[in-house]
């Protein structure tokens, strides 16, 4: 466990030196400020516009950070040949994968905190939400973090056997497809083809269901904009789904990485 945490710490240090990271955070803060301006132009809907665009900005920028940094976690080690030095040391391959993953998760957590503070400042400036509303914003941000943990696991998986370009493409495709799981399931229910129904059902359960964490869904927007609290059961269900899915993806990543020949 000590070696995993050491790798995670080094990964975090490497990530915070990445200029792309700061550019994306800056862009997210600009989008949040823009949502404040747009909210003032929509009479009667300032609060909803501010929260909607603010959460959307945090989600999308977080996704880009997860993919563009996640796809290089393993590839950079291979390209710089530092993986050979790590493997030569008393470091197991699964420890390298877990350490890289935890390091990026901590990076995402810090970035989410920065962007959330920016959104909170914008909300305070607008003066449209009470203290309870600020607290109810946190569950939505937590759901964003769960979705990013899942995206990071996918990016790490693809980085163990593919190039950065293909890894980014695969990760982004699954992120998009994962928001239409219900549509895929509905199509499988109405289609008359048994083969199509079977394929749709398989894909529905295999493709990650990002709709569980979607911040643009009506439920989450109501939690933040209209002060309707999320149920602990819903939060626990989303957390359990994320943990189980990420555990499966990381396990596959470890198996693939352990089978690679670096000689």
Regions found by a protein language model. Name each.
Residues 1-22:
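Aromatic- and glycine-rich beta-strand/loop motifs that create alpha-glucan
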Residues 14, 75, 86-88, 155, ...:
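Helix-capping/transition residues at the boundaries of transmembrane alpha-helices
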Residues 23-27, 98-99, 170-173:
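Hydrophobic core positions of alpha-helical segments in small-molecule transporters
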Residues 29-73, 97-166, 200-201, 232-235:
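Secretory targeting signals
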Residues 42-44, 166, 170-255:
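Terminal transmembrane helical anchor/hairpin motif
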Residues 73-105, 257:
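Helix-loop-helix units of permease transmembrane domains in multi-pass membrane transporters
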Residues 166, 259-263:
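Short cytosolic juxtamembrane segments of multi-pass membrane proteins
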């Amino acid at each position: 466990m000590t070696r995993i945490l050491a790798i995670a710490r080094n990964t975090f240090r490497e990530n915070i030196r990445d200029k792309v990271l700061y550019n994306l955070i800056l862009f997210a803060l600009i989008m949040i400020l823009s949502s404040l301006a747009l909210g003032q132009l929509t009479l009667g809907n300032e609060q909803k516009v501010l929260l909607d665009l603010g959460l959307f900005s945090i989600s999308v920028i977080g996704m880009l950070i997860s993919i563009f940094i996640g796809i290089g976690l393993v590839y950079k080690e291979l390209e710089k040949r530092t993986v050979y030095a790590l493997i030569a040391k008393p470091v197991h391959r699964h420890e390298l994968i877990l350490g890289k993953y935890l390091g990026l998760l901590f990076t995402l957590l810090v970035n989410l905190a920065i962007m959330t503070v920016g959104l909170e400042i914008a909300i305070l400036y607008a003066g449209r939400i009470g203290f309870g509303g600020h607290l109810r914003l946190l569950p939505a941000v937590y759901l964003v973090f769960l979705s990013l943990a899942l995206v990071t696991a996918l990016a790490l998986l693809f980085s163990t056997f593919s190039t950065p370009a293909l890894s980014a493409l695969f990760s982004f495709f699954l992120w998009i497809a994962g928001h239409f799981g219900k549509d895929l399931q509905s199509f499988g229910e109405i289609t008359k083809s048994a083969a199509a129904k079977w394929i749709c059902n398989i894909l529905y359960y295999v493709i990650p269901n990002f709709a569980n964490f979607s911040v643009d869904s009506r439920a989450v927007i109501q939690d933040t904009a209209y002060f309707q609290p999320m149920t602990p059961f819903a939060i626990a269900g989303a957390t359990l789904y994320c943990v189980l899915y990420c555990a499966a993806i990381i396990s596959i990543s470890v198996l693939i990485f352990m089978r690679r020949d670096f000689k």
